[in-house]
Amino acid sequence: PKEFDEFCEMYKEIRLPFWMQTRPETINNENIKKLAEVGLHRISFGVEHGNEEFRAKVLDRRWKNKDIIERLKIPHKYGLSFSVNNITGFPTETKKLAFDTIELNRQIDADNANIYTFVPFHGTPLRRMCEDLGLIKPETITKCLVEKSVLNMSQYPAHEIEEIKKCFALYVKFPKNRWKEIERAEKNDKEGNRIYEELKVEYLEKYMPKPDANPHGGLEDFKKVENPNYSIDIPGEARPGSKDDLNYH
């Protein structure tokens, strides 16, 4: 678009590193290359959910997983790191459906994979859906992105949502033969928390970037470090919600 070309032409005189948020379907090789050349160093992608049918029906986002996976290979070509934003606890969702989000993230080479609790903001279609289904009272005011679910869903109660969030990064990165351990680590009891802490230490050792790799480098740094090691969020540590999350509730 004209505005995109005008931005790139203008910003090449500034060249301060910048970060942006978008959706996978908006990018291609040409526009990411141009943005990297004028200072883009990091991207956050709103994927939100990994089940195609659920994503289309509930979120009105009609894109195939295979297309998301292919588009998210593009940033690495230009030395750009990126994160993927996911949400769980949507109305009518189940824990089984949440694992489709885990499966999709396992196929994406992001350096961070975030997951947040769905927040039913007033004035959105999903808020009306929640009220129509009796999952929330009309007078209930939502607060922030990192709080427990405010929805009353018997098929996916708040404690199960917290279990998925707690171990999301572990499920994404560890091989599936470790999933039984991770499942036990979901539980907020003495044994579950002990296993979780052990897995967290192992995760940090295996999947955090090495000192000589700069995951925020951009094109110039990418030429110096051709195979940076990417990681995802430290499990169990909450990150502030992004504006990208807010757009699709």
Where are the regions a protein language model picked out?
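Flexible glycine/acidic-rich beta-alpha junction loops that bind and position SAM and/or redox cofactors
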Residues: E53-V58, T88-K96, D111-A158, E183-K190
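Ser/Thr-centric signal marking residues that sit
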Residues: T22, T101, T124
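Conserved SAM/AdoMet-binding glycine-rich loop
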Residues: P1-S83, T88
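Radical SAM enzyme core and accessory elements
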Residues: E139, K143-H249
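Conserved, mostly hydrophobic/aromatic
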Residues: L35, F45, N105, G123, ...
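Short, hinge-like loop/turn segments at secondary-structure boundaries
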Residues: R61-W63, T101-I102, E131-G134
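Catalytic cores of alpha/beta
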Residues: E30-L35, P91-Q107
